[in-house]
Design a protein with these regions (language model features):
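Classical eukaryotic N-terminal signal peptides for Sec-dependent ER targeting/secretion
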Residues: 1-9
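Intrinsically disordered, low-complexity proline/glycine-rich segments
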Residues: 14-197
Length: 197
C-alpha cells in the first residue's frame, strides 16, 4: 500500500501538469442540427468568445462519407476528408491545403478498437498522433505517438436542456499540426456518438 502511494502522487502531479498547460488557441465548435443542400449537418468553428464563425465543417454521407472544411471569410475549401466511418467499417483519408507551400498534403485516420472505447491514430505529413479518451469521459486528448507531446484537446460542454446546441471547447497547444486535423477528428467522433445524441 505504501509503495503505491508515491506512484499515485507522481501520476496525479503529471496529469495536473498536462491539464495546467495553457493553450495557444481556443475554439468553440457548435453543431448545427439542420440539413442544408445535401449535407447531414454542419459544425461551425467559432472563436473562443463565440462572436465570429471562422470555419464551417459540412458533412454528407452516401457510399462515401465526406467532410469539407470551409474558411468562412474566403468561402474557400481549405481541407477535405472522405472515407467510411459511420458504420463498423473505418477507412478515412484527408487533404489539407497549405497556403505557405501552395499545395495539398494528405493524411489518414485509423480507428483503434478497444473493449470500452475507441482511440484513433492519425498520420499527417510525417506526424503520428494518437487520441486518449476514457469511456466515461467526454474529453479527448491528442498527442504525438513517439514522445507523448500534448498537442490538443476537446471536450463537450454540459447542456442544461436537450434543445440547446451541442458545443465543444477545442484547445490547441502546438502549431506543429494544422487545426483542420483536430476539426476532422472531432466531427468523426461526434458522428460516432461522442455527444451520445
Amino acid at each position: 500500500m505504501l509503495k503505491t502511494l508515491p506512484t499515485l502522487l507522481v501520476f496525479t502531479i503529471f496529469i495536473k501538469c498536462i491539464d495546467s498547460k495553457e493553450p495557444i488557441r481556443s475554439y468553440v465548435a457548435i453543431k448545427n442540427k439542420t440539413t442544408t443542400k445535401g449535407f447531414i449537418h454542419e459544425i461551425a468553428i467559432c472563436d473562443s468568445q463565440e462572436k465570429k464563425i471562422l470555419y464551417r465543417l459540412k458533412t454528407s454521407t452516401s457510399d462515401i462519407d465526406t467532410i469539407i472544411l470551409v474558411d468562412q471569410q474566403t468561402k474557400n475549401i481549405v481541407a477535405n476528408l472522405e472515407g467510411i466511418w459511420v458504420d463498423g467499417t473505418f477507412n478515412v483519408t484527408f487533404s489539407i491545403y497549405d497556403t505557405k507551400l501552395n499545395k495539398w498534403t494528405d493524411g489518414t485516420i485509423k480507428r483503434i478498437a478497444r473493449v470500452a472505447d475507441d482511440d484513433y491514430a492519425i498520420k499527417y505529413n510525417n506526424h503520428h498522433l494518437n487520441t486518449d479518451r476514457r469511456w466515461y469521459s467526454k474529453k479527448v486528448k491528442l498527442y504525438y505517438t513517439t514522445n507523448k507531446e500534448y498537442l490538443a484537446r476537446f471536450r463537450i460542454r454540459y447542456r442544461w436542456f436537450n434543445w440547446s446546441p451541442i458545443k465543444y471547447d477545442i484547445q490547441i497547444y502546438s502549431n506543429k499540426v494544422p487545426d483542420a486535423v483536430y476539426f476532422f477528428l472531432l466531427t468523426i467522433m461526434e458522428h460516432r456518438g461522442l455527444s451520445e445524441e
